[in-house]
């Protein structure tokens, strides 16, 4: 009987421990890559045309260079900082060629109203922090401020795609230039 009581206590304590662990862990779960990999539109912000464009141009980019530009939209960051969330996504998705570390992540959190670009070390030469900030300010942020997420993300993606293509001295099939060039001061 004494052994049975100890066993019950161990089972109850274990159940409590794993419940707490599971509940805390669920606050920090991040999304998994979709079957399309390059487009992970969990916040439903992108048009089918934009998704198709990102998929087609990425396939060409990856085939020619091994580089990958992954777009992820989420409803919110589930309590994480955008830097932490983007870093974890970048690592877990395995973006870019493993040896060249030439991946690029464009992350948009709809409810948090935040956008982040995560650059692999292999692309930091052509996309240093200052340049990624300027590209966001010029091609993405003005649209996001106006709730034009599809346009902003597509324009930003096109701008980053152009920079990566230029770095590798290649032409991307079906590549379109950003539709409108706007500075962030026009929306202040």
Segment roles from a protein language model:
Residues 26-187:
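Folded, non-transmembrane soluble domains that reside on the lumenal/extracytoplasmic side of membranes
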